[in-house]
Amino acid sequence: MKGIFIGLIEGYRRFISPLFPPSCRFQPTCSQYAMEAIDRFGVLRGSWLAIKRILRCHPFHPGGYDPVPPCHHKHD
């Protein structure tokens, strides 16, 4: 399932994104962030993180460096 979502984002990056001028306010870009978040946390949590990030990507937000949070494994 992860591969499908990451493939869709890669398709967007390859075929749709080049049609528009760069506008992401963040580093890494929102699409890079989404791919890394889904890869690290899975489809549900990774997509949720990506959606929250995309909602912050607007002209009134300063943007800047905003990496995917680290994965914290619980140790018993």
UniProtKB/Swiss-Prot annotation:
Keywords from the UniProt entry: Cell inner membrane, Cell membrane, Membrane
Domain of life: Bacteria
Membrane topology: Peripheral membrane protein
Broad class of where this protein is predominantly found: membrane
Record's keyword annotation contains Nucleotide-binding: no
Localisation: Cell inner membrane
Cell membrane is among the record's keywords: yes
UniProt family annotation: Belongs to the UPF0161 family.
Protein name, UniProt field: Putative membrane protein insertion efficiency factor
